[in-house]
Amino acid sequence: CWIPDYKLDGLAGELSHPKENTKNHIYVGPLSRFKKKNSKPQYDILAIVSGPEPQRSIFEKILTSQLIKHKKECLLVQGKPESKYYDKINNLTIKSHLSAIELNQAILNSELIICRSGYLTIMDLITLEKNAILVPTPGQTEQEYLAQYLSKENLFQNQNQKNLSISIAQKQSEHFVKLS
């Protein structure tokens, strides 16, 4: 059984390192569609919205209301591949969707990422060595577990959607292990 995680100090805790017999488990490291390359900072914060409705829209509204007041450049990706929306409000750029290549570049060009705590996203962030605030989708127990586990490991900041404070999380994330 191939497992996309590190053999030691895994990214998914008990989800990828079960207590039962692991003789047939082969840890292949994180998998990602993205590639790390040289980049220059363009955004202070990149917020990636995803998840099932209505949580996707709730998350977007919370992020937009806070990012619109942010002093530095921010990008919010709405997670709507069917739309072609673009807007610029103060220092906040809003785009409905980015291709994989564009998203790879946007992540690399951002100081801090705010996103859901899905396992594929976590592997992408680790591959690109990017710091992030993880906000699990409410009711998604795997995401809640991963965000809590990785926060305890001091890899990422974890905040719940209802009480999300970007300014507090930004300050707290300065104390976490720098991945880049």
What is each of the regions a protein language model found here?
Residues 22-23, 71-72, 130:
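A short helix->loop->beta-strand "cap" motif at the edges of active sites that frequently abuts
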Residues 1-27:
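Active-site-proximal region of nucleotide-activated glycan assembly enzymes
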Residues 26-29, 94-97, 155-164:
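Short acidic-hydrophobic, aromatic-tinged amphipathic segments that line or gate anion-handling sites
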Residues 127-175:
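Nucleotide-sugar donor-binding patch of glycosyltransferase catalytic domains
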Residues 103-145:
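A donor-sugar binding/catalytic signature common to diverse glycosyltransferases
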Residues 16-17, 29-112, 122:
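Donor-nucleotide binding loops and adjacent catalytic segments primarily
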Residues 5, 50, 118:
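Short glycine-/small-residue-rich Rossmann-like dinucleotide-binding loops
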Residues 6, 80-82, 138:
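Residues in the short beta-alpha loop(s) of Rossmann-like NAD(P)-binding domains
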